[in-house]
Amino acid sequence: MSKETSFVKNAEELAKQKMDAINPELSSKFKFLIKFLSQFPEACSKPRSKKMQNKVGQEEHIEYLARSFHESRLPRKPTPPTTVPDEVVSIVLNISFNIQPENLERIKEEHRLSMAAENIVGDLLERYLAEKLEPSGWIWCSGTSVKAVDFIHYDEKNNEWNLLQVKNRDNTENSSSSKIRDNTTIKKWFRTYSQRDATNWDNFPDEVSSKNLNEEDFRAFVKNYLVKII
């Protein structure tokens, strides 16, 4: 995507029109998202579609973002990976870890399901934070529309943007980006430590939320969410 990318002048108006036709309840949030991308077009994620990559910032792209913004908020069930297991893994488990042959198939299947569970935890974390933060003006950038940023907030009084990136673990691959430009710093936070049994909720940025965010509340949210979509 070229550095010269820009959004059309009536991008915010188009954003409202497109989202009104999809889900009017999201129109205000999506309009602010497009307002942000209009000011920082270089922060826009590269579309997967090659056709759309040549139309970034145009009306068709704004509609594409609107659909992605909406669809990514719909309930999503965990699904097992479709990849075929590597049989050499079974050999390693048997010889190096003394796993008996009769247990290998069960362990491989449990591993597949565990991977599916791990893959959705990051999404569940963002959904939980969206439920807690959006009532106070933060916007979940659902649909991976913004590079290295998961939540944005516009401070109208000071005409400033606040940006937040969240990760499930401290060893999750992080984007190297720490700023968009013009000293717009991306705040970063992770939920759990990979080398010790501890969470990081106490270090959630105070300037982002004064709500009582904690592991117990997050786990309750996850249970309720999953039960509803069974």
Curated annotation (Swiss-Prot):
Top-rank taxon: Bacteria
Record-listed E.C. numbers: 3.1.21.4
Annotated InterPro entries: Restrct_endonuc_II_SinI (IPR019070)
First-level EC class: hydrolase
GO BP annotations listed: DNA restriction-modification system
Keywords: Endonuclease, Hydrolase, Nuclease, Restriction system
Keyword presence, Nuclease: yes
Chemical reaction(s) catalysed: Endonucleolytic cleavage of DNA to give specific double-stranded fragments with terminal 5'-phosphates
Lineage: Bacteria, Pseudomonadati, Pseudomonadota, Gammaproteobacteria, Enterobacterales
Full protein name: Type II restriction enzyme Eco47I
Disulfide bonds: none
GO molecular function: DNA binding; type II site-specific deoxyribonuclease activity
Keyword presence, Hydrolase: yes
